[in-house]
Amino acid sequence: MTRFSSLLASALLLLLPVASAGAAAPAALFEAKTVADRDSTLTALEAAPTDPASAYAAGAGQFFTALEILAGGLHRHGFESPQSFILPLMRLPVPDNPNPEPLTYDGFRAILVAFRDRLEKSAATLGSVPADADIGMEVDLTRLGIDLNEDGQIAPDESAAAIMASLSRGGAPDPAGPALTFRFDRADGYWLQGYAEFLMAQADFWLAHDFS
């Protein structure tokens, strides 16, 4: 797997089955099929900030939902995702929208503000995890995803594996293929926090300009 795919895997890290996060977390997050189910468990994890594993998972989930906010906003108004090589994690394969809503200047800014604010929350949550926290989480990238088209569902073609396949070769993963399981630790949390702050700076750049 390419370095880019590995980085994307880190960025799309969903809230994983961790013993201290509670027994309900694996079913609600790792196997979440709807945004409502995932968000319900994310809210519960956010309410347990003193637990390092819960904070780590919540911070990753907040980053994950920031990407979803951006993808949903682009899809709602019929835009393609930015193709800049400088921002690979913003190059989400947003589905075509045959009935896009008109986009106003204020609406464009609102998407950026929501994206930026969610990233800020993610960076702060990840930063709260102690440096010596012993965290090891495993995830199958074929079983997690984000809602790219705002239909409230997390479909197989919206999985991390499908997104990575689309970005790397314009294809789709083999449904009968093996699981794509990765293990993430505290060091990956530092990287994710840094990338959240980098993307925040990009959003701030756009928000600092008046294009009306």
Question: What is each stretch, according to the model?
Answer:
Residues 1-5:
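Positively charged n-region of N-terminal signal peptides that target proteins for export
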Residues 19-23:
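Sec/Tat signal peptide C-region and signal peptidase I cleavage site
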Residues 24-42, 63-212:
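Short coil/linker segments at helix-helix boundaries
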Residues 45-49:
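Solenoid-like repeat scaffolds
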Residues 51-54:
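Residue-level recognition of tetratricopeptide repeat
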